[in-house]
């Protein structure tokens, strides 16, 4: 009977560990939402008797910044955030109730006198801080030009290292006015930005918590 109860305890631990575990699916390169837009890159036929093609001409003083679907744009990553928070709570309460000893006639019953005292105190505090910093560059592609003229950009960069891969993915909306003459834009000037920097492989796996650690960190553990 004892071994049966132990078996049930082990089974419960395993089931709870599986319930609290979050499966991580490694990302794959060439995701459709980050791939360059599918365009027809073939040159249109020139007009009869002319070598001029209107859509593929460039004047001497033309702006070389990205502004069309399919153009490339370099995003300079300059992200740094920090946050801190502190909270404290403290309160106390005390009360006292006294019942005087009753007197009957001329006799006083001191043993029947009652005195009740009570006090309660609570003191709690908490603090947290977090900081992130990301610097680098990634060249993305213009996927769409919205009716108001802003550009919807998207792209990814993969780096194959010794023990795994690292990748940067970025999507967002950029104003043409924020693009410099060098066809660059700061990541701080991107609206609705989605920036992902992560990795996969041996190094990424070594930083992942095992199933037993995830069990003790899950909400199912009452301690």
From Swiss-Prot:
GO biological process: bacterial-type flagellum-dependent cell motility
Protein family membership: Belongs to the FlgH family.
Main location: membrane
Organism (species): Vibrio parahaemolyticus serotype O3:K6 (strain RIMD 2210633)
Record-level Gene Ontology MF annotations: cytoskeletal motor activity
Domain of life assignment: Bacteria
Lipidation (S-diacylglycerol cysteine): 18
Protein name: Flagellar L-ring protein 2
GO cellular component: bacterial-type flagellum basal body, distal rod, L ring; cell outer membrane
Membrane-topology annotation of the record: Lipid-anchor
Keyword Transport set for record: no
Keyword Lyase listed: no
Lipid linkage positions (N-palmitoyl cysteine): 18
Keywords: Bacterial flagellum, Cell outer membrane, Lipoprotein, Membrane, Palmitate, Signal
Biological role: Assembles around the rod to form the L-ring and probably protects the motor/basal body from shearing forces during rotation.
Signal peptide per UniProt: 1-17
Subunit structure: The basal body constitutes a major portion of the flagellar organelle and consists of four rings (L,P,S, and M) mounted on a central rod.
Cellular compartment(s): Cell outer membrane; Bacterial flagellum basal body
Coiled coil ranges: none
PROSITE patterns according to UniProt: PROKAR_LIPOPROTEIN
Pfam families noted in UniProt: FlgH
